[in-house]
Structures are given as structure tokens and as C-alpha cells.
Amino acid sequence: MKVELYNHIVRNGLTRRTMLKGAASTAALAAMGGAVPALADGHSALRAAIMKIPGVGMGSPGDAEWQKVGEMCLGPVKDRVKPGEFKGVELTFMGLNNQNLHNFLFRGFLKPWEAYTGAKINWIDLAQADYNPRLQQSIATKTVDFDIIEMGAPFEGDTAGQGLLNEMPDWVKDQIDYDDLVGYLQPPVGTWDGKAYRINIDGDCHTFCYRTDYFGSGSITGRANPPKTWQEVNQISKDVDGKKDPLTGLPAHGFLDPLKGWGGFGMYFLTDRAGPYVKHPDDPAFLFDIDTMKPRINNPGWVQAIQDVMDLIKIDGAYPADQINADPGTTGFQQFLAGTGSMLTWWGDIGSNARTNDSSVIGDVVGFSMIPGSDKVYNSKKGAWENTYNEAPNNAYLGWGVYVTNRVEGDSKKRKAAWSAAAHIGGKDISLWTSAYPSGFQPYRNSHFVYDEWEAAGYDRAFIEDYLGSNLDTYNHPNSLNEPRIPGIFQYYSVAEDELAKGFAGQYSSAQETADAIAAAWEKITDSIGRESQIKLYKASMGL
């Protein structure tokens, strides 16, 4: 969650949030085209109680709080499972250990579940950079050694498409209130061939994080407001070179591009830059041509994004020293939170740590907005640039979900136990808590946007409207980037990272040559998987 991240967010222009200031009705949100929040139901007392654990301003929660919330939210489990019903069942759960969250939270939430049901859970904890290789190994060998997995929707083509997942029972849909999702996470996301597999636990999007003390009267940028376009971002990065950071007194830096790969996940950060250049409002595609799967990664829009990064690499001091070895974990947690640099894009984790992480020094000088746009966009259909402002925020990774694998098939007791555990950590009430406190997960249910629940818990009304609205701005943007759930998507991303690293290190002569190398590698991946099947799945993933 990102509640502690800031007291105020600087945003320019008329947005959904500024129009909603002081609005009390959910109808106001609906009129703006956003998701209509589901009103609090019979669990309102429980929801109010868990929202006060540990309470506003009482510090970052830990295992004791996670276990308490898990215990308080056991009601739906007890309605469907008898005490000790799963005694003797052992389950293996594979997930992340990022920033001591993810699996750490799940352990806490599930300890009361284990005590009640009698089941035992064994854990496979993975760092972000190790996640894709570990999963791809299981996919390639079809040797799945886990019963439950924390996984993003982009991998559904690799897993559900190959029969590695177990279909969600109807009773689970009832327990988790399956339909309570913001629009972009509704099916077909989480489904394959009409069958449901995913319990949503997150709603991913990248937002723009910036240092408010770099802007305003007397600031080192000389600009009143943060940038609205990537062209401005690069210019600011050049302008602050050689100046002193107003907070630390160390060298000032502009945008923090991660120049080192991150197990395929680093591709999302180049996509942040490229999106407004390449995602034309009249074209649903941005990675491949729809009818041929021909890569677009080497078209003028993508090349411009790569060139923007290379332009900053050429300027000694534009980036911190040794940026070539900085992955997104470095840029977010070792640089930006520690006071190095003034701008970056990231998931909500940065916000949730800005005021709760002991290593953060920027809590009072951090602001957030939607990812910058561009003053031009490349029209792939016409093969020409159009000099018009364009926005294309990035719903990067489509959020984390929890899935049950085919290892449980043939054992009804184990299958029920696995789905019960998954449903518990993806439940409606527990998800409100993960949205409201540091967890690594962003709001994703319509019911998360009931402002009164947050205000009753002690959060400032204006802040909550601003914070939740910043997610809706991206989720509901008509030109947002929603990646295709096709087999091999992270093979494409990983090889792109490899070639980008070569380009950023000067091993290729230009941005175009770098992009051409990625495109050639992507063509080989498509042919190895099967072009015709990829075209079919690519179209299906875009609803065509």
C-alpha cells in the first residue's frame, strides 16, 4: 500500500482526483468513467476493525499484525472448512520475498489458517531477478514442484496454456467475491479457454515518482511544476547535471533509468518511456503487428525511447556513477528512496516505503503522478510520426495473482486445501488491508475505492481521494498499456534486456541497431513457439 507515502501530491491540470475533491458519492466517480465502488457490506464492522491494525501513524506492520489480520479474516474459511479438515496435507507455495513483503505477508496471513485447518505450508522464496528463470525452468521441463504460486497474468499463456494450472472451483469464486474487480482485471485476464484460474491479489501499474523539492520557486530546475512529457524529463535530467541535490548536498541527478536487466521485469521500465511514443490511441497493439507478429520494437517510436536513454548515458553525471549496473531494485530502493536522483517510474512499492522505510530520506519531498506523455506519437499503421500530445500509462504486469497448479489433481483433499489457502490470502476483506498498508500490492477491487472506509480508519479524505484516484487514472485510461498474455512473453522481455544492456554499454553503434537486434531475437522466439498460434493468442489477448 501507499498510504504513508505522502501528505500531498502535486498534480497539474484537471484530473479525476481534483474534480472529486470533497465528493461524497460513488456516483461522482461513475460519472467520471471510473470504476463504481462496491458499498461496504455486512462485513463493514470487520473491515473497520482490520483497517485500524496497527493504525494510522503507528508504524509499519510486521508479522504480529499480519497474523492478527489473517485470524480476523478467517470467517469465510470457517464457513467452508471444518476444524482440522486438512490435517496431514502439505502444500508448497512459490512466491517472492521482495522488500520482506509478499511471501512474508502470506506466511503471517496463513499461520492462523494452518492452525485451524491442520495443513502445513512449505515455502519457496524467490528474489525478483530469480523468479522468471525459476518459473521458466518448471515450464520447460513440465516439472512443477509447487502447489500454489504467486504469479503475474503475463505468465498465463505459459502455464494455463500448457495445462499446468488447476481450474478454480465455483465455491472459491463465491468466497472471494470474484467479480469485485476493476475493469482491466476482469476476464479474459485470469482465464484461459473460458476457465478461471486466478485469484487476484494486486492491481499493478507504474506511476511517476518525483522529488517535489526539485520544482517550484527557487528550485534547481527553475521549473514551477514537474514534467508532463518525456521530452521534458530528459531536458530536466540534462539541466540538473553539475548541480547539488537540495536535500543531500550531493550531485543532483534527473531521471533514474535502470540500465541493468532484472529477469525480464526491467523491460517494463523502457516500456514506460516508449508507451506514449508507440501506443497510438487508434491501435490496440504496441509490441507486435496484429496480423503477422512482426515486432514493433525497432520502429521509430521504440527507437526514440532507447535513444532518449542513450542520450543521457553520453552525459557524464546525468546518471549516478555505475548506473550501467543498476537494476530497478537499485534505482528504487538504493537510489531514489536514499535521496539520489529526482525522478523515476515504479510500482506502488516506492510509495509504501517512502515514509515507512528507515532508509528513506524523501518522505516529505516526494510526489506522484501518472507517467509522462509525449508531444508526438508514432502511427504504425501510417508509418509516420504525428505531432500531437499522447498519453499511454503502463498497467505493468497486470498485477500479481495466486494460482493452484495441476499437482493437486487426483487428490480432492489437497485440492480443496490449496484453493482454501489461496482464497484466504486473496479474500475481499484481507485485500482491503493489503491496499491500505505496506504490502507491495496496489488497490484492485471496486470495493477498495469506498473513501468512507479509509476516512473512518483515520486517513485524510483529500489524501485518499488523491491516492486512490492516481490508481484509477491509470487503470481507466483509454490508452493504457495492457500487455498480451501470450506464451513466451518473458522470453521476449529477457532477450530484450540482454540486447539493451549491450546497446547501453556501447556494443551496438546506435539505438536503431540495438532495436534491430531485439527484433531479430523476437522473430526467432516467435518462430520457435509457432507463429500462427502466437498470432491467434495475441489477437485473443487483445479481445480481437
Where are these regions (language model features)?
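Extracytoplasmic/periplasmic substrate-recognition and gating elements
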Residues: V189, G218-T221, I315, S359-P443
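Long, aromatic- and glycine/proline-rich binding clefts that accommodate carbohydrate-like moieties
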Residues: L46-I50, P61, G75-R80, E90, ...
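N-terminal secretory signal peptides
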Residues: M1-T18, S25-M32
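Extracytoplasmic "Venus flytrap"/periplasmic binding protein-like
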Residues: G108-Y184, D213-K228, Q334-Q335, S342-M343, ...
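Extracytoplasmic/periplasmic solute-binding protein
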Residues: T92, W192-I201, H206, Q231-K294, ...
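Glycine-centered hinge/linker elements that transmit conformational signals in sensory
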Residues: N234-D239, D283-I324, M370-S374
